[in-house]
Amino acid sequence: FTLFSCSTVTAGPVNWEGAEKYITIQQKQFCDLKNNHVLNLYNAIESRNEIKINKVKKQRQEDLDALLPSGTFENWIVKLVSIKQVNSPQDQTTDGDSAAVFELSCGTQIGSGSFLIDGKLTWGATIKFNSRQYREVSKLSSGQFAIISGTFLKLNDFVPSKKETFYASRPLTSGDLQNDKNDRYSNGDELFLSYITYIAAAN
């Protein structure tokens, strides 16, 4: 399996069956943690015990901290879900950036995301306009596979007022868990904000 620049015309994986064998041990362990977390969180929510729910969330974060020192991941193979150009004239730090979302084989999404904070739409983990990563991601199409490296963003980095050190994500809800085998969940009902430091098409 060889990495080429995005401009190189070469055969690459077209589905997860073809891409699975290139998944790194770190990426596989991340998906294993995710699958275990879904089951544990479902059982905790069913118990209607907030202490159990919080314990499950804390344990998942501790497991992720052990697997991903400083939140860093390297050479994960992903499928591009979408790329948007951020239009945020009220926030010049992200205006014009790229908001890219990628999907793992286990359905979890990683990349850029937007959240409402105090009634204001705020973008996190965008790809800076005209950066090398921006130029590379601009060559990709939805459904195409790529190799990426990056860093998960913690919630208190994104929202300084928050005390939690959990990785910033669009959370799973009880509805998501009840429908964990349907198309909605498999298309990524959990999104982790992640700064992308490297990207190349998986040709």
Tell me what each language-model feature is.
Residues F1-A11:
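Classical Sec-dependent N-terminal signal peptides that target proteins to the secretory pathway
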Residues V9-N203:
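OB-fold and OB-like single-stranded nucleic-acid-recognition modules
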